[in-house]
Amino acid sequence: MQQINTYISIYLSLVFFGCDNNEDSMTIDDLKLNQIQVIGSHNSYRINTTVDMHNLIASFQPDLAHDLDYGHPLLETQFSQYGIRQIEIDVYHDPEGGLFYNQRGNLFIGMPVASGIEELLSPGLKVLHFPDIDYRTHYYTFIDALHAVKNWSDQNPNHIPIFILIEAKEESLSSLYPSLSGFTQPLTFDNTALDAIDAEIRSVFGENLDKVITPDDIRGDNESLESVILNGGWPTIGESRGKIYFGLDNGGATRDAYVSGHPALAGRILFTASDPGTSEAAFLKLNTPTESISDFVSQGYIVRTRADADTEEARSGDTGPRDLALSSGAQFVSTDYYVADARADTSEDWTNYSVSLPGNFIARENPVSGSGNFFDMEIE
């Protein structure tokens, strides 16, 4: 009888605590995109200005020179060496080519105005931070940057998805000083220019976009993208490995123009930073880390925030914004300092401030929206 009772006890244990426990059979690949957290880089393409250009900017806009004193290595290095899985690329409209070939700020530092860079003569979107004075970049064209991402992705097909945030820019020196003349005048990002973003992505990733996660992939046959993501509709990590997805950094009129004619982003490639309550809302850009981010994350939105800005934290060593960004559950925590500024070793103006996930993980289970099963495990 005792042996029979033992068998019954074992059987009941299996029934109630083993075989039917779905959590025990869950794997990391079953986590959804909104259930992880990664480190991102800000203005990821950017090379710091030369000393001479920095000094020129400081002579008329010292605060701007202070804010711009950072740079990044190649995207491939960011992905492989530092585990970055979210990047940001600024693009300017240049349908005829040559708009940014001349770097007119060079006139004031004794450098040639004509860049001599052939890629800048070709038609298409250009990658830079600011015409004439802050133009140094690892990738002159958007297509060059996309190829760099795709090539790395093809060589590392098991990577968790990379999110690329795109800012459509129109800024120039005239934006700072309207009375100035003779400098580059960027073009407006109208509907044609916004369509060019999608077209150039397709030119690199193919018309079928097999490697790209699009709003249509998430929305399916539903009328509202937001309703899908608020009901657990993001794809799993396993379904998304080796893929890329894109977001539009801009709000306001630029965002509205991108959405116009594409309800719930039907047919579009970029997720937009749209307001909760709209049919296209899925990705939120909340640059200032606050505790309220957790509320949006727990609802199902994917959020990008910043751990630092304008070099302030790297100079002061203040880790408060970084720590709040990480604990908020924002899926993308963007920084200029996934490695400390090298000048910290030789200058009192800089600290060893840096941003990484606990354990230097590439990705971790989200502290707010995760399942609770993999908090101590690295995800990649």
Task: Outline where the language-model segments fall.
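C-terminal motif of bacterial Sec signal peptides marking the signal peptidase cleavage site
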Residues: F16-G18
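Catalytic cores of phosphodiester-bond hydrolases, prominently lipid phosphodiesterases
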Residues: N22-I89, H93-E380
